[in-house]
Amino acid sequence: MVDSVGFAEAWRAQFPDSEPPRMELRSVGDIEQELERCKASIRRLEQEVNQERFRMIYLQTLLAKEKKSYDRQRWGFRRAAQPPDGAAEPRASAPRPPPAPADGADPAPVEESEARPDGEGSPSKGRSASARRPAAAASADRDDRGPPTSVAALRSNFEKIRKGPAQPGSADAEKPFYVNVEFHHERGLVKVNDKEVSDRISSLGSQAMQMERKKSQQSAGQGLGEAPRPHYRGRSSESSCGLDGDYEDAELNPRFLKDNLINANGGNRPPWPPLEYQPYQSIYVGGMMVEGEGKSPLLRSQSTSEQEKRLTWPRRSYSPRSFEDSGGGYTPDCSSNENLTSSEEDFSSGQSSRVSPSPTTYRMFRDKSRSPSQNSQQSFDSSSPPTPQCQKRHRQCQVVVSEATIVGVRKTGQIWPSDGDSTFQGEADSSFGTPPGYGCAADQAEEQRRHQDGLPYIDDSPSSSPHLSSKGRGSLASGALDPTKVSELDLEKGLEMRKWVLSGILASEETYLSHLEALLLPMKPLKAAATTSQPVLTSQQIETIFFKVPELYEIHKEFYDGLFPRVQQWSHQQRVGDLFQKLASQLGVYRAFVDNYGVAMETAEKCCQANAQFAEISENLRARSNKDVKDSTTKNSLETLLYKPVDRVTRSTLVLHDLLKHTPSSHPDHSLLQDALRISQNFLSSINEEITPRRQSMTVKKGEHRQLLKDSFMVELVEGARKLRHIFLFTDLLLCTKLKKQSGGKTQQYDCKWYIPLTDLSFQMVDELEALPNIPLVPDEELDALKIKISQIKSDIQREKRANKGSKVMERLRKKLSEQESLLLLMSPSMAFRVHSRNGKSYTFLISSDYERAEWRESIREQQKKCFKSFSLTSVELQMLTNSCVKLQTVHHIPLTINKEDDESPGLYGFLHVIVHSATGFKQSSNLYCTLEVDSFGYFVNKAKTRVYRDTTEPNWNEEFEIELEGSQTLRILCYEKCYNKMKMTKEDGESADKLMGKGQVQLDPQTLQDRDWQRTVIDMNGIEVKLSVKFTSREFSLKRMPSRKQTGVFGVKIAVVTKRERSKVPYIVRQCVEEIERRGMEEVGIYRVSGVATDIQALKAAFDVNNKDVSVMMSEMDVNAIAGTLKLYFRELPEPLFTDEFYPNFAEGIALSDPVAKESCMLNLLLSLPEANLLTFLFLLDHLKRVAEKETVNKMSLHNLATVFGPTLLRPSEKESKLPANPSQPITMTDSWSLEVMSQVQVLLYFLQLEAIPAPDSKRQSILFSTEV
């Protein structure tokens, strides 16, 4: 007998109220039989549940019909006007549900005969608005004219059968009742209330269905299965009934309402121009129509003034994916019904709960909607009738309509506040004569909309930008629209600025149109290929990927064509507001595009993976970059171009803010632009209400959300190897992921490496560190070699840009640069950040900045206060969470300079002088010091440290530091308390034992710092304030060696002059500084690298210049770093470098030789050729630096570190003007060549430091022998 281990225990744990079933499982055959019985039972129970649900929904709808007030607000309707007493008769018969389907068979599709997309019958076949429904006799006459040729005609005949002999004008005319009808995909209507229809009706239906199939075969888009996709909509070629050919029933054709009810001013509207393509169709649902005497059902109680009232309609769900069997139909949406049980909610999750755009007219006509966040039953998101939908089952439903409506509003968020008056708010837009826009909304069920999660967050604030873009946009003042501010400006200047703003908008529109053209370019050949035997993509895929792109192009082309001549013929009274207002009114097309964006990206990715030809096409889309140059194009990917409309719609408010800022309130355009701005802002707000919670969270349990708090790239130490990771901090866990390698056309994907619930996470303390491995440090020589390569590649890229050579060379260089920068980012960090899990596992990250490490610690600890329970994720949950990271991430690129946009600031190159004055705000006396960090090559580096100010709450350091900047944009300052008591140490992560008291940062703005004056600033650190002064000197000015004006001094005087005056071989200042450093500075950490106090250095400089006899006493009392700084300053201020201007180019060429023998001969020959004073001083310093490097284990100064510090100081030539670029607007070229030169200087000095023996100066004559070897 097979042992069913653990089944009974698991059953009781899951179902404590019932005993586990007994199963006799003696063999594999018994198990299979039991499994089949279980499956059969499930099928039977599912059928019974579905039947009962159908009955429940039917009873709900019937109850809603009988009780007109039942759940009215959830349906989204206003109160229906009640018919006069006696005007209605009881219905002849109650509706019945269709017979239950047989086991295993699909149920017959059930719809009302009217429930067809209006695009599937000819709209022109219905009567025009002027023709009201005649008496029944007239309808009978119409039957004799021949077979009907459209669904509308078929519907009219069915209405006649349904109504019987009732006269339309009589007060007791029978109301339309609800019937059960059955459709056949070939014969049309076949049953009414379970009774077979007559042969005549059946033949009419067969003819109508044949006509629909013929039309659907000619249409561009094809639906799923046998269902025709919505096709071209406009005037039918068979039409003989006027221009518009509207249906006679208002419910069946929204345009009937638009043209006949909404024309508030009584004028005739121009005919709609035909749309090229309309993917969504209005579908008649059926409804409770109240007929009056001689009036159309919807107009019975409406007076002339009532026609102007804004009208409402229930939200409808149109899912292109649900039209599988019956060729389309209304699919009720129950995903947001709050009164369903949990099982009902499961049942209501069908295909149509996905994105279902519905038709809409002008967004101007929309009524006030409600935000889904309000969870109100009056929300339009909850307004669907409580009817289930199923993949292959279409149910009838009832709609109680109180007033005529324009269209179903499928949207959340407020378009504009309703003021409650009865005036029609769409008049300003009624003269445009453009077809209706389209709006679409998203259902709230997250699991049904995973394909929509790819949408970036859209911020409607004027100073913000979407997710993917890191470009800074100038923020606009909040009072930009204040007329008092505008009035203060010079009117003439403001109007002139208005023209320039419009010119900028024109240029932007031109670029945007070129991007849309680039998208449309491959669409036509792809569509043509779709009909061949070897299609690249199917028609459905093409429609999904390029959805709404043609409409967007037409909208913006019309806008551009209207704006261009007005700007060309400019005057201060020129009006453009109507164009912007019209553009804003068509934002509904963007709504449809944005809602489809996630599906389009997902489809494109799948197509790229499945078809190499399409992958190639999607990576090489050409957009015109210059209108004046024919062949000037730029290459873009499909992903980039598809994001352009999303990015574009977020900027709609920005241009309007700019335009309004320079438009006087008295100008005719002002009110129109304000209206356009209001529409745009409300549109973006409505999108935000839906996207924000979806983007920032991932559903954990019902009512709970896991939100992303912080993420960044880090280096993880895994068994001694460095690995690049992307770390995500959620509200309840820390997730470590690895970015997968990307191939052409693919989007980012992550692999989960590990996760720790925040309740299980801790930071390691000092007593736990003994068993932890040491951090493998990368030698500085390797890091500098990487920097040399990076600088060389950047220089090559700049040269290629100037030469305008082929893009292949540029792409190859960019790839090499990315690889080298990634390697540098991986090798540079050395500061440990360790996290420990309760299960005993530890993980180590390497960070280059203590500031960043402190930020992560603070964020994790703050969130841990809100977490109380541990948990574990299933593999499916973990995979879903990892997949969501692609959409949720805020850091999209590895922090490399290659990822910077061309218009981003390259940062500052030069020297930053910083004075750390004082700090206030400490609550108790402490031993305090500060450190300074700046960013370089994409990561932050610690550059300087103040002395410790003991036992004080208000330290006054007043220390000055000179920090070299290499593309730096940010200065960070961190304030610590020095811990001398070992019992007090926390020593987290095995690093500094000192306590971080506060941290802050200041942006290094090139505009502010260019004047080379001191800038005072105060940095706030949560109550602690640190006062700083900063001054920047660019490399252009720091390159020059300035000779001293007085020849009696030491600084700035030629070394030969000083040694001759002192009658010594080595200058006194060099000997004194070296002796003092060797006496007490050999074990000083960072000697020569840590900056000394600037005031002490200046004091020593002055003492040496005046030949003060007490200088040795002064030095003994000063910090050793100040003495080291004085020695460096002396060599830096020599009017000619120690290696002389004459020999510097030869040294640079000699170090580049590849043959080691030739290199040694050349370098020694050049060295021994230096003037005697220069040579002896250099050899004296060289011996000292070698002795410093011998203490490397203590002072952390290797030969390479020393070469980095002294290389530029000893070799940098005095005259550099000829090598500087003439155009200062090319900072990258200058800084790259500078970096290469600095690296070369470092290499020259490092070569001599690494030589074991150098010939004595008195062997100078041997240079002849060396030269012969070369």
From Swiss-Prot:
Q: Which residues carry this modification: Omega-N-methylarginine?
A: 473
Q: Which residues carry this modification: Phosphothreonine?
A: 387, 640, 692
Q: Which GO terms describe its cellular component?
A: axon; cytosol; dendritic spine; glutamatergic synapse; plasma membrane; postsynaptic density; protein-containing complex; Schaffer collateral - CA1 synapse
The PTM Phosphotyrosine maps to 178, 247, 553, 643
After translation, the protein is modified as follows:
Autophosphorylated. Phosphorylated by FES/FPS on tyrosine residues, leading to down-regulation of the BCR kinase activity. Phosphorylation at Tyr-178 by HCK is important for interaction with GRB2.
* Region described as Disordered: 67-173, 201-249, 295-396, 412-481
| Compartments, as annotated in UniProt | Postsynaptic density; Cell projection, Dendritic spine; Cell projection, Axon; Synapse
Q: Which cysteines are joined by disulfide bonds?
A: none
DH domain sequence ranges: 497-690
Q: Where N-acetylmethionine occurs along the chain? A: 1
Q: Where is each C2 domain found?
A: 892-1019
- Provide the Rho-GAP domain boundaries: 1053-1247
On the tree of life, the source organism's domain of life is Eukaryota
**Predominant location:** other
Q: Which residues form a coiled coil?
A: 28-55
- Report residue spans for region: Kinase: 1-428
Domain named PH: residues: 707-865
Keyword Magnesium set for record: no
Q: What is known of its domains?
A: The DH domain is involved in interaction with CCPG1. The region involved in binding to ABL1 SH2-domain is rich in serine residues and needs to be Ser/Thr phosphorylated prior to SH2 binding. This region is essential for the activation of the ABL1 tyrosine kinase and transforming potential of the chimeric BCR-ABL oncogene.
Describe its partners and assembly state.
Answer: Homotetramer. Interacts with PDZK1. Interacts with HCK, FES/FPS, ABL1, PIK3R1 and GRB2. May interact with CCPG1. Interacts with SH2D5. Interacts with DLG4.
**Protein's name in the database:** Breakpoint cluster region protein
